[in-house]
Regions:
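Membrane-proximal intracellular helices of multi-pass ion channels
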Residues: 1-279
Length: 279
């Protein structure tokens, strides 16, 4: 929302004031106020390219069941929904992507779009400009990619061994559960341990400055680094960067505030709706 609003201001020829620059800086976890217009331009271009590619890759799947125009519209909508981690169902069946549970191509495309939307625009911007030379990336970019990939793999392994999933479904739900909300299998059929695993994934969420929610993968990373230091007495360093104490304080606040909000919300829902099961 901040990016679109600021983009409209720029298109109309208005200057981006300090307040607007600060809003963009905080929204996308930028390091400085410089190069804001270039960042926004790259953001819109990268988003358009990624969503267009996603729609083009999804089109051959939907054209098999829908007319040309319907397939085009569904492909575009699905690509945008996946990249923005919204999980909207446009198929009209009320079952999300259940009809494509075993469709490898569409599942992989959807996972890829969710992943790209969930690692954050700043990450995409840095990778786009640094030409994949990871040693020049910021700590945020390195951490977002590392944690996003690690959580995806660990989540898939846990889901695979707690439910009778195929590896395709395990990776799909490990990715979708964190922020997107797409479903290829009815959630009502899941075991309690599977639901608990998905709750943890949802609580973690995506990277800062992304289209996803949660406490953020970087928050979890900072807390894990502090735990490692307490156990091994090794310095809090990763990817040739050291982690300042201020980052740990912020991560702790976000983590415990997240737990508090989830607990209070769950308590109120269970209290006002006693007929709803806990899991």
């Amino acid at each position: 929302v901040a990016a679109v609003g600021t983009g409209v201001i720029v298109v109309l020829g208005e200057k981006l004031n300090f307040k607007g620059r600060s809003l963009i800086k905080n929204s996308f976890n930028l390091n400085s106020l410089g190069g804001m217009i270039r960042f926004l331009r790259s953001l819109f271009v990268a988003t358009f390219i990624i969503e267009s590619i996603g729609a083009a890759l999804s089109f051959p799947v939907f054209i098999q069941q829908y007319t040309w125009w319907d397939a085009l519209g569904i492909s575009c909508f699905h690509s945008i929904a996946a990249f923005n981690n919204s999980g909207f169902d446009i198929l009209g069946t009320g079952e999300s992507l259940a009809a494509y549970t075993h469709h490898i191509w569409l599942n992989v495309v959807t996972i890829s779009l969710i992943f790209l939307g969930g690692i954050g625009f700043l990450v995409i911007y840095e990778v786009w400009n640094e030409k994949w030379f990871w040693r020049t990336w910021s700590l945020n970019t390195c951490t977002s990619i590392f944690m996003g990939t690690t959580i995806l793999i660990i989540g898939a392994i846990l889901l695979k061994f707690t439910e009778s999933f195929s590896w395709l479904n395990a990776f799909f739900y490990s990715m979708s559960a964190r922020t997107a909300g797409f479903a290829t299998i009815p959630l009502s059929s899941f075991a309690p341990v599977t639901m608990m695993t998905m709750l943890i994934l949802m609580f973690i969420g995506a990277a800062p400055g992304s289209t996803g929610g949660g406490i953020k993968t970087t928050t979890l990373f900072v807390l894990l680094m502090r735990i490692r230091k307490a156990v091994t007495n090794k310095p809090e360093e990763m990817f040739h960067y050291s982690i300042p104490n201020s980052a740990f304080r912020k991560a702790s606040i976000v983590f415990f505030m997240g737990l508090f909000v989830v607990y209070v919300s769950t308590y109120l829902v269970l209290m006002t709706n006693p007929h709803i099961p806990f899991l």
